[in-house]
Amino acid sequence: KKIYLPLIFLAVIGLISVLLTTYFSIQKVEKDVYTNEKESLRVYVQNQLEAKYDVAITNAITIASNYYVIESLLKEDRAIAAKGLKEITKTFKEQTDFKNVQIHIHTKDIKSFLREWMPQKFGDDLSSFRHTIKKVKESKLPLTAIEMGVAGMTLRGVAPILKEGEYLGSVEIIQSFGSIVTNAKKDLDASVIFLTDKKQ
């Protein structure tokens, strides 16, 4: 009996050690899997965002040099721009994956000139909350950003509209995050949401 008791005690200690080792090993594996999944999702979303940034800034720059857009600001005639943008938005919807792209033209004093998706709403002052437009006016250079606006948080590419160096206004390509959410679910079976700091 004196011999058996220490053996039983050692066996119990050994079993506890094995269980603890197994438990911590499983915990580490789970943590590693979670970390790897998290990193994969981060890289995936970042790549998706960069693709959208490229689309936004490239098209904003192209539209900023569009004849109809420039003429509409020079003549203060919104109908000219509406005509020019009609074919562009049609092409987006029919020939690209970016079905919900929106185009917004601003005046040089940072007021809404034409929202192609809502032409009846214009003239509102954007200077108090649209910091990207102010930056483009100051630098006369295009940029991309995620920013809050009247339509909520969206990804934007903003470019200056210039005529022989004179700043006439700016144009932005606006995209939602819908395609990223859809693609992440389809490709990774992951649910993605986009949040912003309340202060913004």
Regions found by a protein language model. Give the residues of each.
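Extreme N-terminal signal-anchor transmembrane helix of membrane signaling/transducer proteins, especially
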Residues: 1-32
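Residues in well-ordered beta-strands of folded domains
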Residues: 6, 174, 193-195
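Extracytoplasmic/periplasmic sensory segments of membrane signal-transduction proteins
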Residues: 36-45, 52-142, 185, 196, ...
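Generic short beta-strand
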Residues: 103, 158-159, 192
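Short, glycine-/polar-rich solvent-exposed loops and beta-turns at beta-strand/coil boundaries
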Residues: 106, 149-150
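PAS and PAS-like sensory modules
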Residues: 143-148
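Conserved beta-strands of PAS-like sensory domains
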Residues: 152-186
